[in-house]
Structure formats: structure tokens, C-alpha cells
A protein has these predicted regions:
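OB-fold nucleic-acid-binding modules
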Residues: 3-239
Length: 239
């Protein structure tokens, strides 16, 4: 089963042209990729970028119906797409891609999902504005409550500890000395576990994991039915 099963009725023609992220993702249902051939506009909060190196050449947008990863072929996304700002995505001409069961969007389809929108073209597809009175609030969830509807949304998980006490966020390749993308494991008081995936490019990759029980904020990821959490904006609440 795929990680995304967005089902939403097709909007009537007299409705505004703005659509939901769940509707946009539903257009790819059952297909490896699908070109967006008509003007579909979605609006959502930016919940992930590369401010701490946590997301590479991608941002995550989220509205009240779900979230989606937008592939962009540029670094420094934190400056152009600040965390918590509101972005409007114009979908016409972009391609939805399902990779590992998760639907994302970009300029084309590659071997590992959507290919990044070229830096010189991002202004054509994405516009960004300050949030104003609006504020994104992460949904508080439990590990055993994570399911398809939470993929690419930012959540808060309380009362968890890292299994690998004393380890760093990422392992280091002994040959190159570089940190590598690593999965650690959190466990809650009921014994439920969840992988926490951190990119080797993350600015705190070499720092030790927090000790004790606390809370993590992150975007829910999914690949081939396996869920993980990717910390965003370095939001941690530990003693």
C-alpha cells in the first residue's frame, strides 16, 4: 500500500481556482508520475527547508488537508522559502511523482522521484509571503497514530527518548570522515518505536542526541510503507 491515499471530490467548476494539497496529490493516484496540465493552485505553510541542512534541495508545503514535498534545484532554500512563511504553488507544467509510495512535485520525473525546479524558474511556480496573522501549528500525535494522512505534515511527538543513548545524530564514514545520512530510533512510554532520519548534511549531524525523554517536531516521511520522522527547524524539547 502506498503512503498517500488522498481522496477528495473533484471541485465544482464554480468553486475558486485554489485547490487543496490533498486534491493535488490525488491527481497522481495510481500513477508513477503525472503532468499537471491545467492551472491548479495550492497554498500552504513552509514547514521544512535547508536552514539547518535538514532538507536538501526541497521544501515542504502544508495546508489543512496534508503536505507535499516540492523539489527545487537550488541550495539556500531557507533564505528564499523561510520557515513558517506561506507559499503559493502554481502547478501547471509541473509533474507529480510517486516514489516509494509518496507523492511529490517538481519539474520532471527522475529515478528518485520529482526532479528539482530550476532556480531561475522557481518564481514562476512559487510565490512566498509572510504569514501575517496565520501561524502554522504542528499537530501533536503519537507514534502509533502515524498513518498515510500525516505524510509530509509537521507533527509534534511527546514523551519519547532516543534508543541510541550517547550516539551522535549521524554516523561518520571512517574513510572520508564525512557524516552520512543516518536513522536513529525513538521509543515512547508504550514501547512504540519510530525511525528519525537525519541527512549527513545537517548542521548538527556530529552533535550528541538529546538524553532523557522529551518532544520532537518534524515532518513525517514514508518510503515503501515505512514511516520516519525528519526533524525540522531543529525543534527539540528535552530536559
Amino acid at each position: 500500500a502506498g503512503c498517500d491515499r488522498a481522496t477528495e471530490p473533484r471541485p465544482r467548476e464554480e468553486q475558486p481556482v485554489r485547490h487543496t494539497i490533498a486534491y493535488l496529490k490525488s491527481l497522481c493516484d495510481g500513477a508513477e508520475s503525472r503532468l499537471v496540465t491545467r492551472e491548479i493552485t495550492v497554498r500552504g505553510f513552509i514547514t521544512a527547508n535547508d536552514r539547518y541542512g535538514e532538507f536538501y534541495k526541497s521544501i515542504v508545503l502544508e495546508d489543512e488537508t496534508g503536505g507535499i514535498t516540492v523539489a527545487v534545484d537550488q541550495t539556500g532554500t531557507a533564505a528564499e522559502f523561510p520557515f513558517g512563511y506561506v507559499a503559493t504553488l502554481h502547478g501547471a507544467g509541473l509533474r507529480l511523482c510517486a516514489y516509494g509510495g509518496k507523492v511529490g512535485i517538481g519539474i520532471g520525473a527522475g529515478e528518485q522521484g520529482a526532479e528539482g525546479i530550476p532556480a531561475e524558474e522557481t518564481g514562476r511556480y512559487l510565490t512566498v509571503e509572510p504569514p501575517g496573522e496565520e501561524r502554522h501549528t504542528a499537530r501533536t500525535v503519537t507514534i502509533d497514530g502515524i498513518g498515510p494522512g500525516l505524510v509530509d505534515t509537521r507533527v509534534r511527538i511527546d514523551g519519547v527518548r532516543f534508543v541510541e543513548s550517547g550516539a551522535t545524530w549521524c554516523d561518520t564514514d571512517p574513510e572520508t570522515g564525512r557524516t552520512v545520512t543516518t536513522e536513529r530510533t525513538i521509543v515512547d512510554e508504550q514501547g512504540n518505536t519510530l525511525a528519525v532520519r537525519t541527512l549527513g548534511s545537517c548542521s548538527y549531524a556530529k552533535e550528541p542526541l538529546p538524553e532523557g525523554r522529551g518532544s520532537l517536531y518534524g515532518v513525517v516521511d514514508c518510503f515503501s510503507g515505512k514511516y520516519s520522522l525528519r526533524v525540522t527547524n531543529r525543534d527539540l524539547l528535552f530536559p
